[in-house]
Amino acid sequence: MSVNYAAGLSPYADKGKCGLPEIFDPPEELERKVWELARLVRQSSNVVFHTGAGISTASGIPDFRGPHGVWTMEERGLAPKFDTTFENARPTQTHMALVQLERVGLLHFVVSQNVDGLHVRSGFPRDKLAELHGNMFVEECAKCKTQYVRDTVVGTMGLKTTGRLCTVAKARGLRACRGELRDTILDWEDALPDRDLALADEASRNADLSITLGTSLQIRPSGNLPLATKRRGGKLVIVNLQPTKHDRHADLRIHGYVDDVMTQLMKHLGLEIPAWDGPRVLEKALPPLPRPPTPKLEPTDKSLAQLNGSVPADSKPEPCTWHNGSQPASPKREQPDSPAPRRPPKRVKAEVTPS
């Protein structure tokens, strides 16, 4: 459970702003915003989702900074409520919607701060997923870097040895590697994994649309990755009930439960959310499925700025997709400076004041 995960971390005083009030868009406004989100997804060629703890609360796993989050309750001297274990938690509608979006080629990559393993257990392909803070179900060989996805949580945290050894054969006829296996869960001062950080950075730079789901974007460097999309000329959509650190940079802000938003999005895209039929691990993405016919999206009479509430509703409308009325060039594909940062940044504290 996230409670046990949080308790297993080293003491750390500055966990960011916790317990901020939640904001809910009125139903009609939410519908219009999700229509616009569907339009952006259809218009984009490289969509990246950034996910946080808010996408797993519907499975019974509490978040950290929400009104009843683990750290919010801790600040109040109260015990957080939890309804399940990591092993018993089921992927949410949001997890399964992401699986289907990837299958039909509308989603290029997912960058996740979550350690609950639900992306992998939902069947989302691991080669299109960066788990920046680790996975409670994964252990890695310290010698050959082979990863093992287990059916139960590994049992240790902080990149510690688990007591098991690597069974990968070095070569035909030779004995197994027998390197020590370690968990993949980061503590506060641990450096982010080279491979996952490099993939997340490259995906964020090359995206023409980044969508954040259920994250306050307070933890660095994970929370700053969506800004790489903006710097390259792409769009940023933030879906969260609480204010986030990067709200002022968003082209569209949606305040609603992520499951409700994703359910409406899939409807507007003409896609079904697949049922979850038990844990399954998919190492590599399959060839994309054909997309269904695109349903006609109802036009919205509001610009992105009006939907965000930054322009009066009776002002002259601007083009929905581009602030200056002209379409910018597609973001230039950019490779990271190196395959993996030589000294990856540490998982550092949250910045104190969200914007």
Swiss-Prot record:
Modified residues (N6-acetyllysine): 33
Principal location listed in the UniProt entry: nucleus
GO cellular component: chromatin; chromosome, telomeric region; endoplasmic reticulum; nucleus
Record CDD domains: SIRT7
Gene3D superfamilies found in the cross-reference section: 2.20.28.200, TPP-binding domain
Activity regulation text: Compared to the defatty-acylase activity, the protein deacetylase activity is weak in vitro, and requires activation. The histone deacetylase activity is strongly activated upon binding to nucleosomes and chromatin in vivo. Two molecules of SIRT6 associate with the acidic patch of one nucleosome, while the C-terminal disordered region of SIRT6 associates with nucleosomal DNA, leading to efficient histone deacetylation. The protein-lysine deacetylase activity is also activated by long-chain free fatty-acids.
Subcellular localization(s) per the UniProt record: Nucleus; Chromosome; Chromosome, Telomere; Endoplasmic reticulum
GO molecular function: chromatin DNA binding; damaged DNA binding; DNA damage sensor activity; histone H3K18 deacetylase activity, NAD-dependent; histone H3K56 deacetylase activity, NAD-dependent; histone H3K9 deacetylase activity, NAD-dependent; hydrolase activity; metal ion binding
PTM characteristics: Acetylated at Lys-33. Deacetylation at Lys-33 by SIRT1 promotes homomultimerization and binding to double-strand breaks (DSBs) sites.
GO biological process: cardiac muscle cell differentiation; circadian regulation of gene expression; determination of adult lifespan; double-strand break repair; ketone biosynthetic process; negative regulation of gluconeogenesis; negative regulation of glycolytic process; negative regulation of protein import into nucleus
Binding annotation for NAD(+): 53, 57, 64-65, 71, 113, 133, 214, 216, 240, 242, 258
Catalysed reaction equations from the record: N(6)-acetyl-L-lysyl-[protein] + NAD(+) + H2O = 2''-O-acetyl-ADP-D-ribose + nicotinamide + L-lysyl-[protein]; N(6)-tetradecanoyl-L-lysyl-[protein] + NAD(+) + H2O = 2''-O-tetradecanoyl-ADP-D-ribose + nicotinamide + L-lysyl-[protein]; N(6)-hexadecanoyl-L-lysyl-[protein] + NAD(+) + H2O = 2''-O-hexadecanoyl-ADP-D-ribose + nicotinamide + L-lysyl-[protein]; L-lysyl-[protein] + NAD(+) = N(6)-(ADP-D-ribosyl)-L-lysyl-[protein] + nicotinamide + H(+)
Leading EC class: transferase
Deacetylase sirtuin-type domain span: 27-272
Residues recorded with modification Phosphoserine: 10, 303, 330
Positions with a binding annotation for Zn(2+): 141, 144, 166, 177
Catalytic residues in the record: 133 (proton acceptor)
Stretches that traverse the bilayer: none
Keyword annotations of the record: Acetylation, Acyltransferase, Chromatin regulator, Chromosome, Developmental protein, DNA damage, DNA repair, DNA-binding, Endoplasmic reticulum, Glycosyltransferase, Hydrolase, Isopeptide bond, Metal-binding, NAD, Nucleotidyltransferase, Nucleus, Phosphoprotein, RNA-binding, Telomere, Transferase, Tumor suppressor, Ubl conjugation, Zinc
Family: Belongs to the sirtuin family. Class IV subfamily.
Other comment: Compared to other rodents, beaver SIRT6 displays higher histone deacetylase activity and ability to promote double-strand break (DSB) repair, possibly leading to longer life span.
Protein name: NAD-dependent protein deacylase sirtuin-6
Annotated organism of origin: Castor canadensis (American beaver)
Top-level taxonomy: Eukaryota, Metazoa, Chordata, Craniata, Vertebrata
